[in-house]
Amino acid sequence: VRIPASFCGLMGIRPTHDRINTNGVYPMAPSFDTVGWFAKKIEVFQKIGDVLLNNNETSKAIFKNYVIAEDLLEIAETEVQNEFKKFIDLKLPGISKVRLSTLTKSEIADNFRILQGNEVKENVLPWITKNKPTISPEINARIEMASKITNNEVKLAKIFRNKLVKEVENSLPEGV
């Protein structure tokens, strides 16, 4: 949502998974699907957010600490990293730094693709098979890849996901 919005000169947001109710939304990959929106005017963007995010709900989370996830920052381009570090040094000089995981970016991406692809296979492939729509070669290649994902690959990817979740949870101090 954010990248297409920025290319079109719009504001766009992709909220946290499950933050907005997805009832009535056709599932693609339910473990990852979320509802986002675009708008050109800030007033419209805000009104949509007020409706979709239901601002009457308040979080019960109490944040006592904030941290910098160094391994996530390392993914950013060098210029972005440097500017971010300057800002942190200036505004939050004592902030703690953590590493969320020992797993590599490529391992995480590969397992994400398996889990997401399997959900696409379960949710979208039956519709495509039945309706035979015209699909771009790029999307067709992704659908083809998803159709070949095995149950064993999914099982291993779920084990990997559980390991990643535990690593992230264990890396964060209380109250973050």
Map each language-model feature to its residues.
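Fold-level recognition of mixed alpha/beta catalytic cores in primary-metabolism enzymes, strongest
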Residues: 1-69
